[in-house]
C-alpha cells in the first residue's frame, strides 16, 4: 500500500513539473486548480482573466 502512495506522489510531481508553472492557464482543470472558473465571453466586473479554457473564446476568470 505504501508503494501506491509513493507512485501517486511521483505521478503528481511529474505532472506538476511538466505543466510549467510559468505558463498561463490553458485548460479547465488547471483553471480550477488556480481557483478560477471558465466563462464563455468576458470576465464579469468583479473578476479578472488569468488564462483561457479550451482556446481563446473561453476565458479563465478569478476574483480580483
From Swiss-Prot:
Major subcellular location class: secreted
> Which Pfam family, an example, fits this chain?
Defensin_beta
Localization recorded for this chain is:
Secreted
Disulfide pairs here are 31-60, 38-53, 43-61
Function noted in UniProt? Has bactericidal activity.
Keyword annotations: Antibiotic, Antimicrobial, Defensin, Disulfide bond, Secreted, Signal
GO terms of biological process kind = cell chemotaxis; defense response to bacterium
Q: Which residues form the signal peptide?
A: 1-22
Q: What family classification does the UniProt entry report for this protein?
A: Belongs to the beta-defensin family.
Origin, by domain of life? Eukaryota
Q: Which GO terms describe its molecular function?
A: CCR6 chemokine receptor binding; chemoattractant activity
Example GO CC term: the record gives: extracellular space
Protein name according to UniProt: Beta-defensin 2
* Transmembrane among keywords: no
